[in-house]
């Protein structure tokens, strides 16, 4: 289907002067790289983009470049878990090499949990939809040493290989497993300036190692006493509706900023408005068919809440992590400081009641 899309856009480009092709999610960044290459538009190389979409290759490249790395190993879904018991370091994390939004990511603390986790992941990777999306990658599982510490993410734009940081998000809720739902993101960060500079240096080194030289990036890291560890480095902007929380001086949205940058406009002096803002990705907690969501009006009435948007409709399937890949919706808030925003989001979420039908 990609070839058909490329041909259609080539035909369209004969009538219009295309300046940029931008992928907006994990599925479209490869197409964007292929299109840019065929249209001779400046872009990240296809090889670099593919590195960001394969967690094993990304880990290998980052380790080769000298960045801090956990112990890791890739093994086939057809291998017997006992075959690699001798190499394991507990706790460790199991994950598919190609999925996002924490889908399939599991912390395991023992040989027994490792075996059960491998079985669950093998079942997930054998599902038709997942297999089609992953191709050969659906045959592999990545195991890596668990990295303790505080988790943050960096939203940025890269021009000529140089990272321009747009926001550093703190994740104030503990993410220790066994599953890793990304719930609350708050910006601006409350980390001290020295640590922020250190994180940005690590992010810049990762981009250089992976060959990402242009466009939006979303980078996730963990920080502990040993230093900064890259978890993910995606050649796209933040996922879902989370970008709504980013508002720049002059009223610009993240999407407008990305477009301006891709057209060669200077965005170096762009700054976020000076206000604590946050988003909560409302988790899917129970498997079943969604029937109704109660409490939306009560949640919106909580002081500090600016918006609530649901993304799963009544009649649709609810599938929690680690197998699911969709959030119930998004809650947005603002306040005088990070603690206020966190409390507001948690209070609003407490008003929500999900009615579902078990299957």
How would you describe each model-predicted region?
Residues 119-173, 194, 198-201, 218, ...:
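Phosphate-binding site of ATP-dependent enzymes
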Residues 90-108:
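Conserved anion/nucleotide-ligand pocket segment
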Residues 75, 105-110, 157-159, 224:
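Short beta-strand-to-turn element immediately C-terminal to the catalytic PLP-Schiff-base lysine
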Residues 64, 259-359:
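Peripheral (often C-terminal) accessory segments that flank ATP-dependent C-N-forming ligase machineries
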Residues 106, 145, 187-188, 247, ...:
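Short, well-ordered beta-strand elements within core beta-sheets of diverse protein domains
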Residues 68-70, 91-94, 111-148, 179, ...:
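Conserved ATP-binding module of the ATP-grasp superfamily
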Residues 1-77, 322, 327:
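Conserved N-proximal alpha/beta basic substrate-recognition cap immediately N-terminal to
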Residues 197-219, 225, 234-291:
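Active-site "cap" helix and flanking loop/linker of ATP-utilizing ligase/carboxylase catalytic domains
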């Amino acid at each position: 289907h990609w070839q058909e899309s490329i041909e259609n856009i080539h035909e369209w480009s004969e009538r219009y002067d295309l300046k940029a092709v931008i992928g907006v999610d994990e599925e479209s960044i490869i197409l964007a790289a292929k299109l840019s290459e065929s249209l001779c538009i400046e872009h990240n190389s296809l090889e670099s983009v593919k590195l960001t979409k394969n967690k094993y290759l990304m880990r290998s490249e980052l380790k080769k470049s000298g960045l801090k790395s956990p112990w890791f190993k890739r093994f086939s879904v057809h291998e017997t878990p006992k075959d690699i018991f001798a190499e394991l370091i507990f706790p460790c994390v199991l994950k598919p090499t190609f999925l996002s939004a924490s889908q399939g990511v599991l912390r395991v603390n023992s040989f027994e949990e490792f075996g059960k986790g491998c079985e669950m992941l093998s079942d997930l990777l054998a599902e038709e939809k997942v297999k089609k999306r992953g191709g050969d990658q659906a045959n592999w599982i990545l195991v890596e040493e668990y990295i303790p510490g505080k988790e943050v993410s960096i939203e940025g734009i890269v021009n000529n290989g140089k990272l321009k940081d747009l926001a550093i998000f703190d994740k104030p809720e503990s993410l220790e497993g066994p599953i890793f739902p990304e719930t609350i993101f708050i910006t601006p960060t409350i980390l001290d300036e020295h640590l922020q500079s250190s994180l940005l240096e690590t992010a810049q080194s990762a981009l250089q190692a992976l060959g990402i030289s242009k466009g939006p990036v979303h980078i996730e890291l963990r920080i502990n006493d040993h230093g900064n560890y890259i978890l993910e480095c995606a050649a796209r902007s933040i996922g879902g509706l989370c970008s709504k929380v980013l508002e720049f001086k002059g009223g610009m949205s993240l999407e407008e900023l990305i477009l301006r940058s891709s057209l060669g406009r200077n965005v170096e002096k762009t700054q976020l408005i000076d206000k604590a803002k946050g988003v909560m990705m409302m988790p899917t907690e129970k498997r079943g068919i969604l029937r109704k969501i109660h409490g939306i009006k009560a949640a919106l009435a909580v002081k500090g809440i600016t918006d609530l948007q649901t993304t799963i409709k009544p009649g649709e399937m609810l599938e929690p992590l680690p197998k699911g890949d969709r959030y119930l919706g998004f809650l947005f808030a603002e306040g005088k400081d990070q603690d206020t925003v966190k409390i507001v989001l948690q209070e609003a979420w407490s008003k929500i009641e999900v009615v579902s039908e078990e299957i």
